[in-house]
Amino acid sequence: MHLDVWGARGSHPASGMAFSRFGHHTACLSVRSGDHLLVLDAGTGATALARALEPNPPRVVEILLSHFHHDHVMGLPYLLMSLPAETELRIHASPEGALGLETLVAAILSPPYFPAGIAGVLGRTDCRQHAAGAAFEAGALDIRTHPLEHPGGSTAFRVSDGARSFVYATDLEEPEQPDPAWIAFARGADLLVHDTMFTEAEREVRRGWGHATIEGALQLADAADVARLVGFHHNPVHDDQVMFQREQELARRRPGSGLAREGEALRI
């Protein structure tokens, strides 16, 4: 099993050559399992995924949305409209608030947020809303969920093929005290993809924004005995020079760890 990185930025895309080594697009990852494609978030990176799928589209696409902030759903219409009509489409999420999943997806695919013309896509999309902490299957993959501390809520996913597993945990503010349930959720994962958006100094002035630091990611990885840690949801103002410095610090403290790069495949 390997995890393809189509976008690793947070909040908004980065622009310019100074950001090219770690990438410009916002959150989108994917993993193939037989004739299923599992997509984790659909930020602007989903547009790159859509282009890559054109020669060999999967029979089933299942999309896990951590939450509905723009940087995680901006590419959703482009991905959905790029797929053949015979592709089975499923979207899984645990949105907070009164609006249900189907209502939120319909809004993203409709005016005034998106031009008319893809209403048929919604009609063939199976929107599956799950309670926080739910477990379900996506083809041969087992999915577990865990609620995260983030404005408006967010969801972490643990994905397993029966032999290997990874945890995708973005848009969370690390707890002040160790959370046994959160540690248990990540326990023994082969790969932890974790929000590392803020430096410690940035976090001090942005408490409550719902993002984590390298320190917070390291604490979870160590407490949960995770095999490998990869930082994600990169600050869009952190250029390659800053990113290399942060990655070196992460690798120094936990050898084998790194920061996600757009276009790479993470072996699990």
Could you tell me what each predicted segment is?
Residues 173-263:
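Cap/insert and terminal regions of metallo-dependent hydrolase folds
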Residues 169-171:
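DG-centered beta-turn motif at the end of beta-strands
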Residues 1-167, 182-183, 241-268:
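Binuclear metal-dependent hydrolase catalytic cores
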